[in-house]
Amino acid sequence: MARRSFEYRPDRTEGSLLARFLPTKKQRQKLLKWSLYSLLVLVLSLLQDVLLCKVRILGTTTDLVPCCIMLICMLEGAQRSSIFCVTAALFFVASGSSPGYYVMPAITLIAMVVTMFRQGYLRLSFGTVFACLAVAVFGYEMIVFAVEWISGRVLLERMTAFTLKAALSLAVAPLLYPMAAAIEKIGGESWKE
């Protein structure tokens, strides 16, 4: 009896040598997702350093790159975004636009602690992500201020400027949220919160 095309055929036991190195559809989607996140951080870094550094509101500017890194961590969760957070903070420090090397552990630790709190106690929604992002950004700016004040680079009166910088960064965060949320949907949900 002749086989028909719609009948069951067993899988091939061995693939070609090239097929072993080709990424699967899920791997391609994950690579696309994290590449788009990296591109978003890079574009925000360029936008911050080229355009927004010239726009001063009450003597301060926004700080979009740490805000975006922390937003991505809030959306993706601590387990999936920890390596991205470390590498993005490393590139932020290496770009020369960060206040110092202490920013890398500050961004990473604050983002991971607040993200773990959000994952453990709050649902994933715009309100909870924005509230946790506000805590993280204000905490980051206060750590930057404390280190700068202890090292003698700023006066205590500049604390309002750091608070205003955090508020300006949070004012831009609702514009970043839809972009990051759209990228987060690539590849489907790995688990539901």
Residue ranges of each PLM-predicted region?
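Terminal, non-globular segments
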Residues: 1-193
